Every structure is written in structure tokens, then in C-alpha cells.
Amino acid sequence: FINASYTGFKEHVSLLRPLVQSGQIQVANHTYSHPDLTTLDAEGVKEELQRNEDEIMSMFGVSSKPYFRPPYGRYNDAVLKAAGEIGFTRPVMWNGTTGDEAKTSSRVIYMRCIRYMLPQQIVLGHLNYETIIPILDKVKGLIDDRGLTAVTVRDYYGDASEEEIKAAAPSPTPTPEENTPS
């Protein structure tokens, strides 16, 4: 889930594009500039998602529809309606977060990986912070030891109906002890 306003994606598009086009990684929409969508009117929601979609298409040649992740996990019926009107019908939430923002220690990140990296779980992590890099081998070992496989959002949801996805979706509000993920 990318924000195209973050320059790192454009700087590394030549490395990422082949992975996206081959299906090894999936790009989905996290809005252009990362606003709380519940503070925007319908046109603002559409503009954030569509501008990001246009950038994704330009960089990677693929559409991110129908998936989007609302920044901070915040959405309401008005956001879902506006997003749906332009083809973003599947908000993707998470069951836990690595909490890998810049202020979090590698030890705490790994403890969160132990807690949340379980079967059938969506775990939120970030590409724009380096705090997880020193423990990537350890995290990969945890994933391997647990027999887990990383999959794309498309693989995770498969052919589930909108009603099935909505019924199975985790709460959009992180638990109180967690930092608010972005």
C-alpha cells in the first residue's frame, strides 16, 4: 500500500516495476498524501485515491483497484461510499502491526512479530522506516519456523464476495496499546 507522494517509490521504480508486473508483489492504494479520510468530503476522498491510482498506473502499469488501505485505519460509511464510486470497494485492514516506525526498537518490533505473525493474519509494516532491517533475517526465521507464507492481498481474499470480506474484516481501530499505524 503506497502513497505516491513519498519519493522513494519513484526513485526505485526500476527495481520495483518488474516485481509488480510479474505478480511477485502487489501494489495497492494508501492515498496520495496520507490524510485521515474521515476529515475529507466525498470529492476529497476520491481525489486522494484517484491521484494515487494515476501515479501507480504511471509508475507500474497496473491498477490498484479494488483494494485500498485508509490511512490510520480510519474510515466511515461516507469514505466507503466515495471510494466505491471510483472502484475502490475493498478496504484492507490489519490484525496487528510490527510498529516499525522510526522510534520503535528492533526488540519491540520482533516482539510484535511474534505476537501477530500467525496464520491468516494481515500484519502491517512499513517500507519507509529502516528499524526492521537489522532483524529481517530473524523475522524471516520466525515466518519459516511457523510455516507461514507471505501472499498478496489478492491471494488472501481470493474470490470472496464483498459481504464475506466485510464480515471477516478486522476492526479499523487499532488496539489501545498499539501505536496508531500509518
What are these model-derived regions, one by one?
Residues 1-36, 44, 48-65, 156-158:
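Active-site beta->alpha N-cap acidic-glycine motif
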Residues 1-2, 26-31, 66-70, 90-95, ...:
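Structural recognition of the beta-strand scaffold that forms the well-ordered cores
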Residues 3-11, 36-40, 69-75, 99-104, ...:
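Acidic-and-aromatic substrate-binding clefts and catalytic sites of carbohydrate-active enzymes
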Residues 7, 131-182:
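C-terminal domain-boundary segment and adjacent tail
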Residues 14, 43, 47-50, 54, ...:
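Solvent-exposed, polar/charged alpha-helical surfaces in well-ordered, non-transmembrane soluble domains
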Residues 58-83:
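Basic- and aromatic-lined ligand-binding clefts that recognize polyanionic substrates
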Residues 59-62, 87, 143-148:
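Short helix-capping segments at alpha-helix termini
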Residues 74, 79-116, 148-160:
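His/Asp/Glu-enriched short active-site or ligand-binding loop at hydrolase and phosphoryl-transfer sites
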